[in-house]
Amino acid sequence: MLPRFVSYISNGTYDIGCTGQTVYVYDKYGAELVKFKDLIYAYYSAISPRGDMFVVKSTDGRIAVYSLKTLSLIKKFRYSKVNYAQDDGFCFSADGKYFINIERQGDDLHSAISVYDTAGFSRVSQFLLGDIGMLEDIEQVDGELYVIGFWRNSDLIVTEDFVAKYAEGKISEPVNITKNEYEYYNELLLNKKKGENVKNHTLATLWGFYST
């Protein structure tokens, strides 16, 4: 009997299932290869486009990196002192050279985007959004990165929801979207992290609708 997974993703060669306490790796035929217990509150993972590694993120501010070649832990580290509410999006770059993570930095009301070099998972850049808004998720589509979030006023009250590109260490070309679109696409991205096929619905599609 299979465990009760929160997410279950596949790249056609390996399947990765996360329960929150345990990470399972299966081959494409469903045979269990290994399981890891290096993190708690770890519900979602991402497989590198290169197929050589995968990353698991916990909601308490930690990341674990695993090799799919040796089926072993490569590195585990804390990316933020904020040890709760760390359930925002993450992804690899299209070439697998970088891992991009939305993080709560300072406190749970402030977002950052950190970029890590996958050669050693050292942080190579960080963009802090500050008081003006929050980021919820990030998606790589055809080599470009898109983020979804919301703007805030000086009292930290939400004023508008938006989708934008992320490139060269900054958010660019933001477009405002409706609350319904914001909720719909956040739900789609969550389902994608769970392992569901939502390829026809991307942040790139939403951004393109408003930017043309």
Where in this protein do the model-derived segments appear?
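A short beta-strand motif characteristic of beta-propeller blades
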Residues: 1, 31-37, 72-80, 122-128, ...
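Repeated scaffold domains used in trafficking and secretory/extracellular systems
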Residues: 2-8, 40-47, 83-91, 131-139, ...
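Residue-level detector of Asp-centered blade-edge/turn motifs that repeat once per structural unit
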Residues: 10-11, 49-50, 94-95, 140-142
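Structural signature of WD-repeat beta-propellers
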Residues: 18-20, 58, 103, 149-150
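Structural motif
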Residues: 21-24, 62-64, 108-114, 153-164
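Short loop/turn segments that connect beta-strands within beta-propeller blades
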Residues: 27-29, 68-70, 118-120, 167-169
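Blade-level signature of beta-propeller repeat domains, shared across WD40, Kelch, NHL, RCC1
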Residues: 147-195, 206-209
